[in-house]
């Protein structure tokens, strides 16, 4: 067993720029951390521009024959830093009690905490693995999905998987995610016939039809929520005509909507419902389902996480399904999956930062979770 400082590990990862889609140096850095701990490393690059190339890493340290297998999943890619940082986004900086840098909380910090945690777990405790992608913040086409394919080819499916997304809100340990709503985006087009505004009888203006279509969609009440999920919501996210002329009736009007939905629906059902309304207004729909809703019902796995959090923080975490999508939506097809990590207040913001003490507490929480999962 080795004693590693999660703050130092986080600094090393932050110092490797890894804007999504990520490849290269940041994976070299993680590999250099894991190999001395006895992990066998599998790395591969998938996809092509514009959504790739993407690097992925699966690291496994096998325990005794028949031992339980606990996996930690996460991502090394980060969103672009933007402007206005008070220090370099890809040069970790300690100021006061905080560690600054892009990825500090989302989610290089939690990866560092888990590496430090497993360094304290003996090899004979069971099988441990890391499922790490460079394609979570982007389209997520070439990341966790092909990683799952590799894991199945290796016959290395875990019994339980913890995703290290920053789930905490006000204090480390106040929230654990046991599920997520599904997500579907749709592009709607109403076509007409271009013409002069002074001769409307010679044209077909698609805008009134699109406006009426969107009004029908906006009036929908999808549900009132379920036991573990908030109500589904449909949002109009874009309107486009692309008509710079004041005297021209356009030939086409377009809109985009996004639906976040709970376990009362499937993506396909919602697409069909929108298509039915769109067809009444002579509209066409193209849809992309990003993921279905899922839940790991409260039970032994969530209890061991809650117990670990309570032991180290004194908090009783809320079990929640709020928030956006994550790669847990893919991993749930392999084994039970729960998400827990750092406070998310500064994720995707300038001057992203994590309390250094939170990294050390998270290391201890993760160690407790892993040992419980392997027992």
From Swiss-Prot:
Binds 2 Zn(2+) or Co(2+) ions per subunit. Its cofactor is Zn(2+); Co(2+). Pfam families: M20_dimer, Peptidase_M20. The keyword Zinc applies. It catalyses: N-succinyl-(2S,6S)-2,6-diaminopimelate + H2O = (2S,6S)-2,6-diaminopimelate + succinate. It is an enzyme of class 3 (hydrolase). InterPro entries: ArgE/DapE_CS, Bact_exopeptidase_dim_dom, DapE_proteobac, Peptidase_M20, Peptidase_M20_dimer, Peptidase_M20A. The keyword Glycoprotein does not apply. The active site is at residues 77, 136. Belongs to the peptidase M20A family. DapE subfamily. PANTHER family: ACETYLORNITHINE DEACETYLASE (PTHR43808), N-ACETYL-L-CITRULLINE DEACETYLASE (PTHR43808:SF31). Catalyzes the hydrolysis of N-succinyl-L,L-diaminopimelic acid (SDAP), forming succinate and LL-2,6-diaminopimelate (DAP), an intermediate involved in the bacterial biosynthesis of lysine and meso-diaminopimelic acid, an essential component of bacterial cell walls. This is Succinyl-diaminopimelate desuccinylase. The lineage of its organism: Bacteria, Pseudomonadati, Pseudomonadota, Alphaproteobacteria, Sphingomonadales.
């Amino acid at each position: 067993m080795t004693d590693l400082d999660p703050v130092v590990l986080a600094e090393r990862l932050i110092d490797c720029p890894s804007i999504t889609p990520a490849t290269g140096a940041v994976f070299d850095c993680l590999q250099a951390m894991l190999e001395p701990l006895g992990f066998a490393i599998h790395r591969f690059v998938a996809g092509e521009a514009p959504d790739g190339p993407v690097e992925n890493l699966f690291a496994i340290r096998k325990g005794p024959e028949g031992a339980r297998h606990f996996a930690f999943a996460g991502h090394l890619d980060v969103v672009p830093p933007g402007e206005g940082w008070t220090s370099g986004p890809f040069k970790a900086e300690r100021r006061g009690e905080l560690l600054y840098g892009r990825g500090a909380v989302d989610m290089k910090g939690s990866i560092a905490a888990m590496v430090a945690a497993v360094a304290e777990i003996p090899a004979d405790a069971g099988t441990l693995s890391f499922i790490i992608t460079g394609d979570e913040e982007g389209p997520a086409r070439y990341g966790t999905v092909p990683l799952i394919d590799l894991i199945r080819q290796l016959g290395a499916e875990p019994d339980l998987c913890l995703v290290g997304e920053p789930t905490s809100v006000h204090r480390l340990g106040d929230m654990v995610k046991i599920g997520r709503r599904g997500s579907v985006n749709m592009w709607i087009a109403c076509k007409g016939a271009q013409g002069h505004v002074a001769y409307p009888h010679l044209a077909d203006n698609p805008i009134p039809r699109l406006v009426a279509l969107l009004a029908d969609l906006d009036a929908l009440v999808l549900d009132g929520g379920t036991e573990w999920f908030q109500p589904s919501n449909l949002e109009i996210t874009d309107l486009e005509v692309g008509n710079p002329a004041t005297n021209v009736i356009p030939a086409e009007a377009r809109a985009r909507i996004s639906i976040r939905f709970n376990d009362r629906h499937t993506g396909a059902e919602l697409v069909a419902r929108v298509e039915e309304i769109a067809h009444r207004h002579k509209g066409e729909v193209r849809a992309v389902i990003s993921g279905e809703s899922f839940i790991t019902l409260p039970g032994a796995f969530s209890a061991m996480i809650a117990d670990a959090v309570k032991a180290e923080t004194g908090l009783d975490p809320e079990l929640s399904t709020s928030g956006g999508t994550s790669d847990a939506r893919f991993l749930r097809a392999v084994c039970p999956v729960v998400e827990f990590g750092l406070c998310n207040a500064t994720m995707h913001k300038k001057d992203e930062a994590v309390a250094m003490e939170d990294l050390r507490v998270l290391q201890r929480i993760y160690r407790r979770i892993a040992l419980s999962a392997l027992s």
